[in-house]
Amino acid sequence: MTSTRGSLLYEGKAKRIYASNKEAEVLVEFKNDATAFNAQKRAQLEDKGRLNCQISACLFELLEREGIPTHYCGLESDHWMVVQRVKVIPIEVVLRNVATGSLCRQTPIAQGTLLDPALLDLYYKDDDLGDPLLTESRLFLLDLVSPESRQEIETLARQVNAVLTPFFSALNLQLVDFKLELGWNEAGELLVADEISPDTCRLWDMNLRDEKERILDKDRFRQDLGGVIEAYGEVCKRVQGATPKPRNYR
């Protein structure tokens, strides 16, 4: 059984969300658009949507097997998936296992420093504001989530990290950092939403020492390194080789 596509509900930088014939579900189309720096840099990369969809499906199912709830229902095609409709929390959760990127620009922490335990940062999801960092006081002031919900969010995010880090390590990929979006479904259950892919994760090839060659994620696009699709394809190949074939939507 397939899901019937309805009207376009939302179009973001990397995905389109459509209504389906089930009120509690939506269809997600993964686009070939590549963006960086809050969409100030843009490009079309053939096959990017398919790769991110397939990687995300494999990783969502991996999390589910480990008891971590996600919004994923099943694949509709190679670049479409069906997911539960969720109320997305306007907070971006970032887990950092290795210091790089903005953390090193904003602090004296050296590039490549291992962070144990992982550093968890919360950001307010607003492109116009540049996704600012949320302190505890700002969270309270904005009244985005209750203290209990914040604890639930952070616990779930650390559980995701505890599953993904050793999984990627077994594939000779270092999970440097990643961002998560979470939301509540109709039953009030907190779910991992959005996607988990090289668009949302920094992944370094542990077989390579060169700081640029080892990058297998969106930084290849950000830094004009080239080989973006080849890098995403390599991640997809390793992930698919270590996980069951993702289920189709039924």
From Swiss-Prot:
GO terms for biological process: 'de novo' IMP biosynthetic process; cobalamin biosynthetic process. Signal peptide: none annotated. SUPFAM superfamilies: SAICAR synthase-like. InterPro entries: SAICAR_synt/ADE2_N, SAICAR_synt_PurC, SAICAR_synth, SAICAR_synthetase, SAICAR_synthetase_CS. Transmembrane segments: none annotated. It catalyses: 5-amino-1-(5-phospho-D-ribosyl)imidazole-4-carboxylate + L-aspartate + ATP = (2S)-2-[5-amino-1-(5-phospho-beta-D-ribosyl)imidazole-4-carboxamido]succinate + ADP + phosphate + 2 H(+). It holds the Pfam family SAICAR_synt. GO terms for molecular function: ATP binding; phosphoribosylaminoimidazolesuccinocarboxamide synthase activity. Its EC number is 6.3.2.6. The keyword Phosphoprotein does not apply. Disulfide bonds: none annotated. Pathway: Purine metabolism; IMP biosynthesis via de novo pathway; 5-amino-1-(5-phospho-D-ribosyl)imidazole-4-carboxamide from 5-amino-1-(5-phospho-D-ribosyl)imidazole-4-carboxylate: step 1/2. The keyword Nucleotide-binding applies. Belongs to the SAICAR synthetase family. This is Phosphoribosylaminoimidazole-succinocarboxamide synthase. It comes from Synechococcus sp. (strain CC9311).
